[in-house]
Amino acid sequence: MSIKFFLLVSRQGKVRLAKWFNTLSIKERAKIIRDVSSLVITRKPKMCNFVEYKGEKIVYRRYASLFFVCGIEQDDNELIILEVIHKFVECLDKYFGNVCELDLIFNFEKAYYVMEELLLAGELQESSKTNVLSAVLAGDAESEADAQQDSLQKLVGSVKKR
């Protein structure tokens, strides 16, 4: 199982997250995003969640107003990828508390961080939601401590100048 790309696309076709696990030019990425988004968005809800695209498979799942889309090799297992997508959504739900599109727009770096804890080089790295969330929360605590230390140093620096 190797994911080539992971996209989050709104119903309007706006890309909310894009993670590429293969090296592609910006032009190729834009074409894939355009083609795959229009392919997935226009499908009816009762249709299969797997689509052929240029010798690859597209696996997608819709949650509320977002499509979670993965591009995989032809011989990879689609059902495992659906589970990976679901695991990612569950992790986002736990982290944000019932995640919505606005959470992903305004906190996209956190969503990427959750994805990076879950996936490594297109492979499932961590299957435990608890481990993923504890790593993300530890990173949050560390960045919070760094921010406090930076503001404290700025405050001390401004006092010394007086």
Curated annotation (Swiss-Prot):
Keyword field: Cytoplasm, Cytoplasmic vesicle, Endosome, Golgi apparatus, Membrane, Nucleus, Protein transport, Transport
Function: Component of the AP-1 complex which links clathrin to receptors in coated vesicles. Clathrin-associated protein complexes are believed to interact with the cytoplasmic tails of membrane proteins, leading to their selection and concentration.
GO molecular function: clathrin adaptor activity; clathrin binding
Cellular localization per UniProt: Cytoplasm; Nucleus; Cytoplasmic vesicle, Clathrin-coated vesicle membrane; Endosome
Subunit structure: Adaptor protein complex 1 (AP-1) is a heterotetramer composed of two large adaptins (gamma-type subunit apl4 and beta-type subunit apl2), a medium adaptin (mu-type subunit apm1) and a small adaptin (sigma-type subunit aps1). AP-1 interacts with clathrin.
Keyword set includes Membrane: yes
Name assigned to this protein: AP-1 complex subunit sigma-1
Primary localization: cytoplasm
